[in-house]
């Protein structure tokens, strides 16, 4: 199965164009004011139009209410909703039903115990994103450049598509894919020159590294 590469936290047309030209399968737009990657609806709509027909547009929210989600869906018209907060399985199911869009639920991972919630989320989400659990005191749940122990997913039995995130770089993406056998990778801080500032060359280099791993696995 082809590998999905997602570049998350894009906030400018230049970096979005760089990700698209490099072959990103998904572009992630962040709607969370505590993040340096947060975009307003107007900017997000412009980036989504640029990506239309070239990559899937993913709207990342954190414990968003229906009003915020409705505004995003109406204005940006994303292909996928990424729920990156503490949304319960019931809330995930409700959002999926209300907005009639596929949903990817992020699960924070630090120890094997964190996988206990997986079956309940897998029953309602369309895709799972395994991300590193944020350190204590962090003001946002992801995009922190922190990795988790990928071997926790080594014997994972999951029929649902899943991606890995957290601390990925062009130097470790091959190991992450080899160990987890994930169907996709999601990167944000690993392709930045500063928090929230995407680097087009790092984007290109990461996608090349991920694609090289994909070719080796064929």
Curated annotation (Swiss-Prot):
Keywords: Amino-acid biosynthesis, Aromatic amino acid biosynthesis, Isomerase, Tryptophan biosynthesis. It is an enzyme of class 5 (isomerase). Signal peptide: none annotated. Its EC number is 5.3.1.24. Pathway: Amino-acid biosynthesis; L-tryptophan biosynthesis; L-tryptophan from chorismate: step 3/5. It catalyses: N-(5-phospho-beta-D-ribosyl)anthranilate = 1-(2-carboxyphenylamino)-1-deoxy-D-ribulose 5-phosphate. It comes from the Bacteria. Coiled coil: none annotated. GO terms for molecular function: phosphoribosylanthranilate isomerase activity. Pfam families: PRAI. GO terms for biological process: L-tryptophan biosynthetic process. CDD domains: PRAI. NCBIfam families: PRK01222.1-1. HAMAP family: PRAI. Belongs to the TrpF family. This is N-(5'-phosphoribosyl)anthranilate isomerase. It comes from Rhodopseudomonas palustris (strain BisA53). The gene is trpF.
């Amino acid at each position: 199965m082809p590998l999905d590469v997602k570049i998350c936290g894009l906030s400018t047309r230049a970096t979005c164009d760089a990700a698209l030209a490099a072959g990103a399968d998904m572009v992630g737009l962040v709607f969370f004011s505590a993040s340096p990657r947060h975009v307003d609806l107007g900017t997000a709509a412009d980036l989504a139009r640029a990506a239309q027909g070239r990559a899937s547009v993913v709207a990342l929210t954190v414990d968003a209410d229906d009003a915020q989600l409705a505004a995003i869906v109406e204005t940006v018209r994303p292909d996928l909703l990424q729920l990156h907060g503490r949304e319960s399985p019931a809330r995930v199911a409700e959002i999926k039903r209300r907005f009639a869009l596929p949903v990817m639920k992020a699960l924070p991972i630090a120890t094997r115990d964190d996988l206990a919630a997986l079956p309940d989320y897998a029953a309602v989400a369309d895709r799972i994103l395994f991300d590193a659990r944020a350190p204590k005191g962090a003001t946002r749940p992801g995009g922190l450049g922190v990795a988790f122990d990928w071997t926790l997913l080594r014997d994972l039995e999951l029929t649902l598509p899943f991606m890995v995130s957290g601390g990925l770089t062009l130097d470790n993406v091959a190991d992450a894919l080899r160990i987890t056998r994930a169907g996709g990778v999601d990167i944000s801080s690993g392709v930045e020159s500063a928090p929230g500032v995407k680097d087009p060359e790092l984007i290109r280099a990461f996608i090349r590294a991920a694609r090289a791993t994909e070719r080796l696995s064929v």
